């Protein structure tokens, strides 16, 4: 029997639980008007209005087995030379993904952990320092690590962009046949939130490419400065699309919703999380994936701080623009594992 509900409230603390309560009206006001109407089916599948919407797989088990379960649910096996794109974490930041959490998945796909350098000012701004951070944070102990822009970057085309016609990524990306975009979902001081779309855009961008995105294609030498917040947010979506297009059919996306600070892993002294961990989600559609994570954050009883961060930066624009340019769909089916 199908029971209609107007909003999903999922409470995931230590045990697996999915609960649906309240009314869509209040949820849509807090989030945005396009929150899809969902209903629960007998097989625990949460289905938006369009039954053929992209699947997003969810588990509340934030452990190696949970991570493996959502990866396997995708039905797309990472093959060839596999890159696993993570955030190595700024020294002093305790919130980046734990190597012990991701080790089994990385080794199952025989993956190489990949990253790109940041702009000057960070302790990950050059390859030598960045490799040392990766070692200090335990990543070199579980897999090879490659800094994609350690020697050069390359231009890849952006199709359908409003601001960008090209995107600058680490040149060593061409060494890999398949991309696993493994992201820590959290707040962000510039983008409002960081998930798959940010990891695909700023994450794969070279040091100069990061400036290119922040400046909406005006310069490669401005660091993090943005003349227009909205143009920056839309440029992130466009840069993400260039990576998705390059690896079409050879890329998948996983978001881990733990250590949910309002700040990103690039800060050495981030704010402490003020909400409980939620779970791990995976999809073949990065827009659907980030949208599902945002919806879960909005539905959480303790999500006020991260919601405030998202809204104060107009962060939902990145998702909206990503859908507009054809990167993916905001409608999704959330399937519990």
Model-predicted segments: where are they?
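Sec-dependent signal peptide cleavage junction
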Residues: 21-39
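Extended, low-polarity segments enriched in aliphatic/aromatic residues
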Residues: 50-337
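Intrinsically disordered, low-complexity segments enriched in Ser/Pro/Gly/Ala and basic residues
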Residues: 10-11, 25, 33, 52, ...
């Amino acid at each position: 029997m199908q029971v209609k509900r107007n909003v999903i409230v999922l409470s995931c603390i230590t045990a697996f639980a999915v609960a649906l309560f309240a009314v869509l009206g209040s949820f849509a006001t807090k989030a945005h008007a396009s929150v899809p109407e969902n209903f629960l089916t007998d097989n625990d599948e949460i289905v938006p209005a369009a039954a053929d919407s992209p699947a997003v797989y969810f588990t509340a088990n934030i452990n190696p087995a949970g991570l493996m379960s959502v990866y396997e649910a995708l039905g797309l096996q990472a093959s060839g030379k596999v890159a696993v794109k993570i955030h190595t974490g700024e020294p002093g930041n305790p919130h980046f993904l734990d190597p012990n959490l991701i080790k089994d998945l990385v080794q199952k796909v025989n993956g190489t952990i990949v990253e790109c350098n940041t702009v000057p000012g960070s302790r990950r701004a050059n390859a030598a320092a960045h490799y040392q951070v990766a070692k200090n944070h335990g990543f070199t102990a579980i897999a090879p690590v490659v800094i994609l822009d350690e020697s050069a970057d390359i231009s890849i085309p952006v199709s359908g962009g409003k601001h960008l016609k090209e995107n600058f990524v680490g040149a060593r990306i061409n060494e890999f046949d398949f991309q696993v975009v493994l992201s820590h979902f959290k707040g962000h001081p510039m983008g409002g939130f960081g998930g798959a779309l940010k990891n695909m855009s700023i994450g794969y961008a070279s040091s100069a490419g990061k400036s290119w995105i922040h400046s909406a294609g005006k310069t490669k030498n401005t660091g993090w400065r943005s003349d227009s917040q909205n143009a920056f947010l839309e440029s992130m979506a466009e840069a993400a699309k260039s990576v998705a297009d390059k690896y079409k059919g050879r890329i998948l996306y996983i978001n881990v919703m733990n250590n949910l600070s309002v700040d990103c892993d690039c800060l050495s002294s981030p704010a402490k999380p003020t909400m409980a961990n939620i779970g791990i989600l995976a999809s073949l559609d990065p827009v659907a994936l980030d949208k599902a994570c945002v919806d879960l954050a909005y539905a959480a009883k303790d999500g006020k701080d991260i919601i405030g961060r998202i809204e104060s930066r107009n962060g939902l624009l990145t998702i909206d623009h990503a859908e507009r340019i054809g990167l993916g769909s905001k409608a999704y089916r959330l399937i519990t594992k």
